[in-house]
């Protein structure tokens, strides 16, 4: 986006902006719940009043992932009553087994979003499919399928923080400056990175414990084989509480990270957003969360603000009600896919026709490629494996094979001799979201062949390790047989509503004052590391500007 677009946004913002007094006037929506006598340590402390048809709210946040959680916290701290609309459920009620989430080895309906079968990235082992039939339910992990890729996303209060491995990685500064040149990197690295790390509860594993525990034998084996081929490895921070994990290993607390839990949620240990940012927002007494509601339309309202249409669904995904509410300001935080699809649809259908032509562009899969190697029997990986990754192979500085590869667990409960890696490659390929008038849906133009550049980069690294070790790839993990590379999915969707192109330099949609984008759709397709910390930090930076310039 040019400076002129930003200046135009500043000029028009005053015409249609809503004053802070008007924002505060909407407090009636949450008045019954503001005077809470005590606060729990999770977002379940937020009032769960369901939005009613015809309600008016000062600030509506679509989604409760990283960007949405930051927006909710900073708005409520500024005194603004804020309503989050979340498509998934609130994961705060145990099932019949006494647990909120199910484990990976024995998944049930809680595992997947409105699916009849689990859909794990490692789908096969030694010729056998390992996905299992389940009852259809609003489970925690979604694998949304497009023609060339499936995208894993978290569903529920806390978004992707509920289902990821928690690796809290800071991107290389020179690469951050390359992909987001309009953002002051000094400010980001000196102010917003530390703030986000604190807010997310980032911590580091005790390296002495790491070296001795059986639970990280897989990571030590992955490190050893990488280093023998001349590659650099690095410890990586995480939001899983490693002191809790030590107690798990000692048998003092219930196992989660050591109990086969991660992609379908952790019952303990992980500092997901419902326990950090969202819990802090709830503690202000000004946050309300409406769950099991899916936003389908946003358009200017008569007079001022925006009309937001949403569908209420039941736990089997059936639409049980349609509602229209009015919001003075709307913050899009439905994730790279959700926000991009919604805005592309709104532009194409004439509800927000003046959105930039850049909306929908610049989507990428963060270069995600998964691969497994078959180690020799003397390089075992262990029958006991923590589900929380703590180490990666850092080859980003190599221009011929720039990758950062997470040494991933394969917690099967038995010795597999498999080293598994989730590689983030510097794949330059991008795609766009586009409206399909024939189906009325939004398509993604990504083709599976666009992963070939990423495969080529990863292959240079892992071919070298295999050659040095005298080992081979596992070809039975991502299909029945003869499929080496997991190249048909991503855990790290990024882009679609790029910062300073589709928005101004702070996530405003300048053609529509009062509309903001605060999630991973702002990041142009690849950040070189696990992206959630970057998304959080960018949201912190943007919300500082939005609150100081547009609201207060």
From Swiss-Prot:
Catalytic site positions: 406, 492
PROSITE patterns in the cross-refs: GMC_OXRED_1, TAT
Post-translational modification: Predicted to be exported by the Tat system. The position of the signal peptide cleavage has been experimentally proven.
Enzyme Commission number(s): 1.1.3.6, 5.3.3.1
Subcellular location field: Secreted
Alphabetical list of InterPro entries matching this protein: Cholesterol_Oxidase, FAD/NAD-bd_sf, GMC_OxRdtase_N, GMC_OxRtase_C, TAT_signal
Cofactor: FAD
Keywords (A to Z) from UniProt: Cholesterol metabolism, FAD, Flavoprotein, Isomerase, Lipid metabolism, Oxidoreductase, Secreted, Signal, Steroid metabolism, Sterol metabolism
Catalytic reaction annotation: cholesterol + O2 = cholest-5-en-3-one + H2O2; cholest-5-en-3-one = cholest-4-en-3-one
Coiled-coil ranges from the UniProt annotation: none
Gene Ontology CC terms: extracellular region
Signal peptide segment: 1-45
Main location: secreted
Biological role: Bifunctional enzyme that catalyzes the oxidation and isomerization of cholesterol to cholestenone (cholest-4-en-3-one), an initial step in the cholesterol degradation process.
PANTHER family, A to Z: CHOLESTEROL OXIDASE, FAD-DEPENDENT OXIDOREDUCTASE 2 FAD BINDING DOMAIN-CONTAINING PROTEIN
Domain free text: Contains a FAD-binding domain, which consists of three non-continuous segments of sequence (including both the N terminus and the C terminus) and a steroid-binding domain, which consists of two non-continuous segments of sequence.
Protein name, UniProt field: Cholesterol oxidase
Gene encoding the protein: choB
